[in-house]
């Protein structure tokens, strides 16, 4: 996503902060590889703190990526504040990478409701998740996400990581009929050929 940020995001970021789990601080080979690819990437271990990172002083657009700390995020007042306050007033975007979207937690529901885009990867071992999310987002089309993945599986078998972007942003430039899409990155020829799944 960072590699093709100009195709994915509508603004450039003055700073990008990548937050790794504190448990891997002793073995940071992965983070070192990231720094080699993205030299300007700021890497920290654990959850972010807006004041400690001095993100309030920079009025330009900033991005925080929190990787593999979803359970901690849904219990964190700091993450809650980033979603509900700082993202609106401090020009901060945040990406949470997790494995259990419906985890029961103190702030999980609020984080979900304040998430403007969800990227869902196909997991054939958990079809119930797709059904639950479809019913929550598209109550009149409870099979829309499963049908979209079935289309990708049938027509793009060579793509290992099949994903859907569900755009629920109120400021999205696309109409509601295009809120579910895939293939958002450029292909080998440099052209982006998105696929849309209108919930009709």
Show the residue positions of the predicted features.
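Conserved P-loop NTPase motor cores
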Residues: 1-26, 31-32, 36-144
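P-loop NTPase motor core of the ASCE superfamily
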Residues: 3, 78-81, 117, 128-200
